[in-house]
Amino acid sequence: MQRPISAFLKLGGLYFLPRTLDKIRKHARGELHAEHHEYLGKGFDGRLCHFLGIDYAALTTRTLAGGTDEEILAWIQQNGRTLTEVDAMIWNGFAAKRGWRDDATPGLEKNKADSGLAHRTDLVTYFDYYEVDEGRAPR
């Protein structure tokens, strides 16, 4: 089973979008690590789709129909809301800091404890946590 790619990767200037597409593809091939199944279309995936003005099920259908990430981005831009550079800055600022001094902090701390990472005071956001929990070097 495989982990998704890093949340720090960008597509169309947006963090997490490549990860969402990667999870959709890996899940369809039966390659996505089971711990990610319950969050498909929820959490960051769901928030990103809401922000983009698209339905997660429609994004899944389009992604599995094939094409490059850039082609799927073009579909998102045609079917979702028009995003400005400021919109991307707002999303990226929200996403990259989620878990740091906000309503998600208790959940992040629980996830760290459950993963044996409670001692890692350098993991202050979900993105930080994902990197280490999924075997990548922290940024």
Predicted features by range, described:
Residues 59-115:
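Amphipathic protein-protein interaction modules
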Residues 8-15, 19, 39, 43, ...:
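Alpha-helix boundary/N-cap detector
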Residues 1-35, 94-139:
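Polar/charged low-complexity regulatory segments
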